């Protein structure tokens, strides 16, 4: 009896969700000249999307975004989801994809005292969640030990160290030039 050897392949689908990561990543955000805000891309169940704050503008279909410190670009597609001050959009790009997308898990469980970080233009601004949404205020608040220039940072991703995923979108801060308190909206994909 002859043994038949068959090759065995393990294939990973492009639609596999990106798993959480152990360390807060260094991430280069996306920007559009003339807009005072930030976009980022993330993986949700194997599909890639852009997130931004509604109040910053620049989310018209066909708008070209540039990755900070790079020639990489993305073209804004259609809106697929929105929340109070948060928009989720499709996009196309030849150079921005799965490899550097931020991981996301549905229904993020953000808690008081969680270590989080604002990711913007390759910088990691570390903070701690100090307040959860109350009453009509839908924001979670993070406090940093060092001040940061918040002007133009609306739309930046807020990343949870404990969960290893992006959990929210920065929308407000207590100062444009020397903030130490930032408010973010939880990213809740349908």
Annotate each predicted stretch with a short phrase.
Residues 1-7:
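Sec-dependent signal peptide recognition
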Residues 11-13:
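C-terminal motif of bacterial Sec signal peptides marking the signal peptidase cleavage site
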Residues 17-72, 163, 169-175, 179-180:
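Catalytic histidine site
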Residues 40-41, 76-80, 129-133:
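Short amphipathic beta-strand and strand-loop transition segments with alternating hydrophobic
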Residues 46-126:
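Conserved active-site neighborhood of the chymotrypsin/trypsin-like protease fold
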Residues 96-154, 169-179:
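Flexible, gly/ser-rich surface segments that form the specificity/activation loops bordering the active-site cleft
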Residues 180, 187-190:
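Pro/Ala/Gly-rich low-complexity, hydrophilic intrinsically disordered segments
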């Amino acid at each position: 009896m002859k043994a038949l050897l068959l090759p065995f392949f393990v294939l990973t689908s492009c639609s596999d969700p990106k798993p959480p990561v152990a360390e807060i990543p260094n991430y280069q955000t996306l920007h559009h000249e003339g807009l005072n805000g930030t976009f980022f891309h993330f993986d949700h169940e194997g599909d890639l999307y852009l997130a931004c704050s509604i109040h910053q503008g620049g989310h018209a279909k066909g708008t070209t975004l540039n990755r900070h410190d790079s020639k990489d670009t993305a073209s804004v597609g259609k809106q697929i989801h929105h929340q109070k001050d948060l928009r989720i959009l499709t996009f196309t790009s030849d150079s921005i994809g799965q490899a550097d997308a931020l991981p996301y898990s549905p229904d993020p469980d953000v808690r008081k005292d969680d270590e989080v970080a604002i990711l913007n233009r390759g910088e990691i601004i570390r903070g701690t969640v100090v307040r959860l949404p109350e009453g009509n205020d839908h924001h979670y608040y993070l406090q940093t030990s060092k001040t940061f220039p918040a002007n133009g940072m609306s739309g930046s991703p807020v990343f949870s160290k404990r969960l290893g995923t992006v959990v929210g979108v920065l929308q407000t801060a207590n100062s444009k030039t020397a903030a130490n308190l930032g408010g973010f909206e939880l990213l809740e994909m349908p």
